[in-house]
């Protein structure tokens, strides 16, 4: 998902206002909320809660949005230089693992 420039500007403005320490804390909180939403969805799919599955999917979507917003802020505030290269290396490594798995089958 590509984030439109207008949203990036808003994200950066918020990041600049609150600063890195506060936004790292907020990212940790939002990731925790996403974890809880994912677990609740898993329970809903197994019929272990009264919450409808659709409601848990909506909650996951909300929390993913929060985490993505916070990640964009941390990336911006952290001024990481090698992030794209690291991501590409990790993706390539996983694709190599997938190919190796296919060869073993």
Which residues fall in each region the model found?
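Flexible "arm" and connector segments at domain edges
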Residues: 1-105
């Amino acid at each position: 998902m590509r984030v439109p420039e207008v949203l990036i500007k808003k994200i950066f403005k918020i990041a600049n206002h609150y600063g890195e320490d506060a936004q790292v804390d907020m990212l940790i909180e939002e990731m925790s909320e996403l974890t809880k939403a994912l677990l609740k969805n898993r329970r809903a799919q197994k019929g272990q809660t009264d919450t409808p599955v659709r409601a848990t999917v909506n909650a996951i979507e909300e929390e993913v949005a929060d985490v993505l917003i916070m990640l964009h802020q941390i990336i911006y505030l952290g001024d990481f230089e090698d992030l794209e290269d690291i991501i590409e290396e990790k993706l390539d490594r996983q694709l190599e693992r997938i190919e190796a798995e296919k060869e073993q089958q």
